[in-house]
């Protein structure tokens, strides 16, 4: 995973490395040249870029917490949940009381999903060391075998942990709404409409998606 890195402290877990994809500047240059909306959006956000904390368990756990809620709501619940364990590690999560997890704002279903995720990591059921060499669809197939992880969550993982450059998460409500607002004056948008718009984004669909998200919510999306 090629990336430029800087150290950032985390109040709950040990210091992690924040990383931005090395391809970001190249992608932005391409998108500004190929797409009228990107030409308008990208300069609005200056040097801001996608960042990953580089931890696969945290990335997937945050994706589960963020399912079907706004970016702001997801951040609030995550902060409450992340304050519970001594460290955000699978073994620590498995020691938490269900009532405490529910009190943090997690639904019963999301609690089940997070526990199952932690068990998959602790049990060595995931090919974590092989992910960097696997293609997108192979990784998605492995991840969707975990309860609570569907294609959307797997695609968030590809974007935010592995920083794959050309992921188009068509199940993402924010992406569809953003395409509607930015390209179709707010009119309803189908998946085929979204695919057609994204033709100009290739091979940098992940980057364009990130800017579409930012156009809807000033709070950067992070997992």
Show which residues each predicted segment covers:
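C-terminal accessory module of base-excision DNA glycosylases/AP lyases that mediates lesion recognition
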Residues: 1-48, 132, 136-137, 151-223
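Alpha-helical ds-nucleic-acid-binding substructure associated with the helix-hairpin-helix region
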Residues: 18, 37, 41, 69-70, ...
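A positional/architectural concept
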Residues: 26, 32-63, 68-79, 83-86
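Non-catalytic interaction surface on structured domains
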Residues: 44, 52, 56, 103, ...
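Alpha-helix C-capping/helix-to-loop hinge sites
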Residues: 48, 63, 67-68, 84, ...
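Structural motif
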Residues: 50-58, 105-109, 198-205
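A general alpha-helix detector
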Residues: 59-64, 96-100, 138-142, 174, ...
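Short alpha-helical scaffolding segments that buttress acidic/His motifs in well-ordered protein cores
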Residues: 60-65, 114-118, 157, 208-212
């Amino acid at each position: 995973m090629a990336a430029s890195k800087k150290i950032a402290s985390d109040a709950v877990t040990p210091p992690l490395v924040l990383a931005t994809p090395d391809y970001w500047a190249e992608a932005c240059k391409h998108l500004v040249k190929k797409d009228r909306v990107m030409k308008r959006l990208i300069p609005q956000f200056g040097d801001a870029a996608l960042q990953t904390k580089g931890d696969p368990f945290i990335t997937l756990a945050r994706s589960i917490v963020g399912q079907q809620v706004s970016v702001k709501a997801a951040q609030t619940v995550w902060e409450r949940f992340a304050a519970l364990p001594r460290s955000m590690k699978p073994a620590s999560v498995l020691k938490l009381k269900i009532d405490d997890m529910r009190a943090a704002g997690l639904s019963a279903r999301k609690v089940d999903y997070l526990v199952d995720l932690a068990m998959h990591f602790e049990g060595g059921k995931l090919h974590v060391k092989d992910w960097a060499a696997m293609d997108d669809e192979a990784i998605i197939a492995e991840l969707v075998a975990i309860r609570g992880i569907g294609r959307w969550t797997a695609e968030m993982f590809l974007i935010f942990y592995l920083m794959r450059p050309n992921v188009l998460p068509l199940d993402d409500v924010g992406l569809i709404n953003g395409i509607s607002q930015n390209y179709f004056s707010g009119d309803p948008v189908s998946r085929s409409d979204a695919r057609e718009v994204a033709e100009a984004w290739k091979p940098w669909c992940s980057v364009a998606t990130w800017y579409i998200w930012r156009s809807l919510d000033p709070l950067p999306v992070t997992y």
